[in-house]
Design a protein with these regions (language model features):
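Class I SAM-dependent methyltransferase SAM/SAH-binding core
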Residues: 65-121
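A short SAM/SAH-binding and catalytic strip from SAM-dependent methyltransferases
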Residues: 131-144
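Conserved beta-strand signature within the Rossmann-like core of class I S-adenosyl-L-methionine
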Residues: 160-167
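Conserved alpha-helix/loop element of class I SAM-dependent methyltransferases that forms part
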Residues: 42-62, 75
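A generic alpha-to-beta junction signature in SAM-dependent methyltransferases
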Residues: 58-60, 84, 157
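A short glycine-rich, Lys/Arg-flanked "PGG" loop and its adjoining helix->strand segment in the class I
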Residues: 147-159
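N-terminal, positively charged/glycine-rich alpha-helical extensions of SAM-dependent methyltransferases
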Residues: 1-34
Length: 168
């Protein structure tokens, strides 16, 4: 049995388990990669700059609903919750990533709604969000999954809403 098959549970896509189990699904790697020096090294020293640019474009309109597609290592989610007073919905297919996000947002959890779901097939209503935020997601996706995510974003973002993509 291949090692990655141990991670094929709870709706985890095959490509994620096969190619990225070591980075996003294994508890020891989740702990390892969520250290600022590691994240900054992966991003060639640009993490803080990219985070600041992302936060500068986050929706601040009172009453807006934001969706952050997938958890990410680092401080995006807690920073986003401190930056805006809006409700932030955060979804990820990986339970370990959601647990990590929950631990980082305890002090602002009244505005953070966590949900376990695949970004390729969101369980949200049409036109549910004023802004959808993607922080380093697309480079991890195979082309067909990427297209499904594009389609889902178009479905859940309100007319006149925005999509904020930070990528390298």
């Amino acid at each position: 049995m291949r090692l990655y098959k141990r991670f094929l549970k709870g709706g985890v896509p095959e490509y994620l388990a096969r190619y990225y189990w070591w980075a996003y699904l294994w508890e020891k790697s989740i702990w390892f990669f969520d250290h600022q020096p590691v994240i900054n090294a992966i991003l060639f020293g640009q993490y803080d700059r990219l985070l600041e640019k992302t936060l500068a474009h986050a929706e601040e309109k009172p009453g807006a609903k934001l969706l952050q597609l997938t958890c990410v290592y680092g401080k995006l989610t807690p920073s986003l919750l401190r930056h805006t007073s809006n409700e932030v919905h955060l979804c990820d297919v990986a339970a370990g990533q959601l647990n990590l996000a929950r631990s980082k947002t305890l002090d602002v959890s009244d505005r953070c709604r966590l949900a376990r779901m695949n970004a390729e097939s969101l369980g949200y209503a049409n036109d549910a969000f004023d802004q959808v935020i993607l922080f380093f997601l697309f480079h991890e996706l195979p082309p067909d999954a990427r297209q499904h995510v594009y389609d889902e974003i178009a479905r859940v973002v309100k007319a006149g809403g925005s999509v904020l993509i930070t990528e390298y």
